[in-house]
């Protein structure tokens, strides 16, 4: 009987681990709170403790028969890293507060209203929170693309300046290298011109008649 109980415990544990793995994989990856299935308000130490429990639960070594365990573990690890990062956590908290305030205003509820603690309000809050985070991510990506485009244009401008400088240096180099030839040609031209002028000057005019 004891063996049966142990077997059932193992089956239940395996099912729970599988459900947690699937939950993590289907969570909203831009929101580390959603990955850990918590809301803002927990201390960093509590977040770390929760992460340790969940990571042990879904660790690939304990779920060798589940090929999705490794991906879920990586996602969970990143979420924990995000939430112990003050800047990222504060950004998520700010989006959460904005979503909550928007809903309170739209639904004309006070922060102490019983409806604020209802499942429906929590569902709506998570949806609005998600929308805000998506909008923020889109804005960040556009800003990065714009910054990249500006960098590429500046790089192209600098490259053109460098090419023009190189052309000018090469042109000046050729000019210097051909100086002697130009001087020689000019002297030859002057000498030839002078010689022709002397010929014309010494040439007797033809007598008509």
UniProtKB/Swiss-Prot annotation:
Residues 31-96 form the J domain. Residues 149-175, 187-209 are annotated as: Disordered. The keyword Chaperone applies. Pfam families: DnaJ. GO terms for cellular component: nucleus. PROSITE patterns: DNAJ_2. SUPFAM superfamilies: Chaperone J-domain. Keywords: Chaperone. The keyword Lipoprotein does not apply. This is J domain-containing protein spf31. The lineage of its organism: Eukaryota, Fungi, Dikarya, Ascomycota, Taphrinomycotina.
């Amino acid at each position: 009987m004891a063996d049966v109980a142990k077997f059932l415990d193992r089956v239940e544990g395996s099912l729970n681990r599988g459900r947690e793995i699937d939950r993590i994989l289907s969570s909203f990856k831009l929101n580390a709170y959603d990955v850990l299935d918590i809301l803002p308000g927990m201390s960093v130490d509590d977040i770390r403790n929760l992460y340790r429990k969940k990571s042990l639960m879904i660790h690939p070594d304990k779920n060798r028969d589940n090929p999705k365990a490794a991906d879920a573990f990586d996602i969970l690890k990143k979420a924990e890293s995000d939430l112990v990062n003050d800047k990222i956590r504060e950004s998520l908290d700010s989006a959460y507060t904005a979503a909550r305030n928007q809903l309170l205003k739209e639904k004309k509820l006070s922060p102490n209203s019983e409806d604020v603690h209802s499942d429906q309000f929590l569902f709506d809050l998570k949806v609005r929170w998600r929308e805000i985070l998506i909008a923020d991510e889109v804005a960040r990506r556009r800003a990065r693309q714009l910054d990249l485009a500006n960098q590429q244009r500046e790089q192209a401008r600098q490259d053109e300046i460098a090419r023009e400088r190189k052309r000018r240096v090469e042109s000046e180099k050729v000019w210097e290298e051909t100086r002697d030839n130009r001087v020689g040609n000019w002297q030859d031209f002057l000498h030839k011109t002078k010689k022709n002028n002397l010929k014309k000057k010494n040439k007797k005019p033809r007598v008509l008649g």
